[in-house]
Amino acid sequence: MGKIIGIDLGTTNSCIAIIEGSKPRVLENSEGDRTTPSIIAYTQDGEILVGQPAKRQSVTNPQNTLFAIKRLIGRRYQDEEVQRDVSIMPYKIVAADNGDAWLEVKGQKMAPPQISAEILKKMKKTAEDYLGEPVTEAVITVPAYFNDTQRQATKDAGRIAGLDVKRIINEPTAAALAYGLDKETGNRTIAVYDLGGGTFDISIIEIDDVDGEKTFEVLATNGDTHLGGEDFDSRLINYLVDEFKKDQGIDLRNDPLAMQRLKEAAEKAKIELSSAQQTDVNLPYITADGSGPKHMNLKVTRAKLESLVEELVNRTLEPLKVALKDAGLSVSDIKDVILVGGQTRMPLVQKKVTDFFGKEPRKDVNPDEAVAIGAAVQGGVLAGDVKDVLLLDVTPLSLGIETMGGVMTPLIAKNTTIPTKHSQVFSTAEDNQSAVTIHVLQGERKRSGDNKSLGQFNLDGISPAMRGTPQIEVTFDIDADGILHVSAKDKNSGREQKITIKASSGLNEEEIQKMVQEAEANAESDRKFEALVQTRNQADHLLHSTRKQLEDAGDKLPADDKTAIEDALKNLDTVLKGEDKADIEAKMQALIQVSGKLLEVAQQQAQAAGDGGADGSAKADDDVVDAEFEEVKDKK
């Protein structure tokens, strides 16, 4: 069996590591560097350049030099974040036929996984050159908050690059593996703060050390899939452009060549300001007008840069609070804080993290290499080269289905350890219902429409029966890569339908943040909605049973009583779809009050039939959740 390599496929830089003997080793690429810029260029003569060679020619070929592609993986063209990138990126982002965000290079449309595969090919070649043998298997890391589509797209990129992706693991978890492998012994809880080029993650991880056997268990994870060093660069670029416009009256945003030079200068200035208090951005001949060439020469202080990006750094603090809360811990329970990602070298980031946790982050973990090392460790575990290490990762958001009244019923809660499998029995909402549509959702809200729709499928051929009688077992199965498989089975007929969820688009930063944060901010409105739906369901049940009793009673019920009950039924039916819980309850009480005589008749009939109670048939439903499914025609 060959080596399983570990790859950190980053937004800004990528890195590769292997297990040599029993120790991880980061490999140098053909340029002699331990990290490779995640940049791909398509030259005029048809050559594809990757890494440093692509970066070097970017100023003269901005429209065909692609970077930060990871921000587009698994996203829709119309996503707000993609539209923001469309306006600032020098290359062309276009809509694919299915609505995904793709790129156009020299008139040809290309998918993000196709482009990311070029970086993975270079990583693969680096390993093959070092090992002197073919490499076909890899562990690739992704942000913890990547959703199903983005994970699938990453696996696709691996396949395009000729790699069998044995496992997708979360970046903070990989960093914890790198930290925990040879650091101190004993049980401890750590926080991994991962601020990379395009994404942010926080994971709370418990390391249990029993006689040298280490278990890495993720307790909670949170993050933002569209926040990273690229956003910090953009803030500085916009400031430089605005200052130049004030000084010279020329807007450089319309000049791709100037913007590419400015991007490089801004990135360089940002890095310099991590160790210096002031730097110069000096770009001669940046542009020209009728009066001649123009030069940019601006001083930027660390204080100025910090004022531009402080809001971005503060945005990382809320996920920290949520992750700690989800883990049931406080900052005092965290023994070590690990910083991952190049952007964590910024003094302001380090200060904010130190202030939040009340302790200095560890300095002995390389933020650029830790993730690749962790991926290599996991590869070593899978290959049998690394013993005594067990990794228990989690799913970042709750998963469930839509049930009666438009409620999201979770089957797997967020931060559940994966792989995992959970089944629950649901039933029909209508008599003789022959088909149901299983609508799969991801998110934290009670109202199904407030969550992310991952897909839906039909289960038909259900045996005709009274509502609440069929037993439909829905099973959610998440594999070790965090990819979801759903099945639905009619326990009576044995008919079963399965699907591997492939969401139509990735969850964008706004959607994910909204799901978790709004779920907490709007907990009260969620509770009210849940109570309203419960009342609606009770009213619906009352309507159904009363109508059935009315039908069974026939002419044994006095005409006046029958008219009063029919009026009360009509009144309750009218308010049932409204939002006024009190009104529904009042109409239910009114129906119950006028149904006294009907109840007497029903009891007499039941006794005559010798079944000892009118509610015997209802008992069969007790362990079944009412579910209402609506068949939806697939949009072609």
UniProtKB/Swiss-Prot annotation:
Instruction: Reply yes or no: does the keyword rRNA-binding apply.
Output: no
- Positions where Phosphothreonine occurs in the chain: 199
What UniProt keywords apply to this chain's record, in alphabetical order? ATP-binding, Chaperone, Nucleotide-binding, Phosphoprotein, Stress response
Q: InterPro entries in the record, alphabetically?
A: ATPase_NBD, Chaperone_DnaK, Heat_shock_70_CS, HSP70_C_sf, HSP70_peptide-bd_sf, Hsp_70_fam
Gene Ontology MF, one? ATP binding
The protein's induction, as recorded, is:
By stress conditions e.g. heat shock.
> Which protein, by its recorded name, is this?
Chaperone protein DnaK
Q: Which organism is it from?
A: Sodalis glossinidius (strain morsitans)
